[in-house]
Amino acid sequence: GDVYKRQGETYDWDACRAVMEKHNDEVRNEQEKWNFMATPYTAAALTVPNLFHTFYYAFSGGRNPEIMKAERKVMKILEQAYESKTNCFPKTRYRAITWGGPPCYWLQFPNWLYNCWGILVIAGMDLFSGNVLIDTTDEDTMLDGIARNYETGVMRRHLTGGWQHLVEFWDEAEKFHCDMVILHDDITCKGALGLTGVILDQAKEKKTKLMMVSNDMFDHRTVSRADIRQQVNDYMYSVMQAEPLDASLLQYDDYEGW
């Protein structure tokens, strides 16, 4: 009331409701995409799904009409690949999910994993943020839904959340039929902190393989792209007893690559 008097404006709850309902449409569409991504015939994997979710979907919240236009095109591609039983990623040896803060200075990391080792990254942690359906019945239910949606934000739910935020990846890996989890030990955000030991203990009881890879999120000088590749190479050789699909990609000089 006092804010309204001072500003001379009244909050438009009808406009809020309209935007929240569009947000719900985006959420339902996102969840439908996951059903296709869980199959062997997904046309969505590697870097693109996470990038789209993080930089377009997450910043829309029902306000950007271009989101659903793009999503409808994506859905057609997913449906066509599934109906025709097309294997869009024929070099796949392992299906993986990534969790934790990724190296923002190497967004093509999933593409390298696939081309070098046949590791198909189906989904990443960022994909599971901001997907709460909001009850638009009244003002209180909308505010409650908005708050719960904020709770699932990347820096809240996945890294410093107040519940079983980090270990949810075991369940997500199972939903997407993944046999490998790549846990980003992001030193900028202090990684998994004290949960690292818990995660390693849990991994001993799981059939899903766990690979921990360090990065420094925004600073390639601390943990370079070559350092990240070497961590993966060492794991694949020693733990998985695997050979690369393309040995020429094991290491190369991209230190100055901006």
Residue ranges and their predicted role:
Residues G100-G161, H165-W170:
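Redox- and metal-dependent alpha/beta enzyme cores, enriched for Fe-S-associated oxidoreductases
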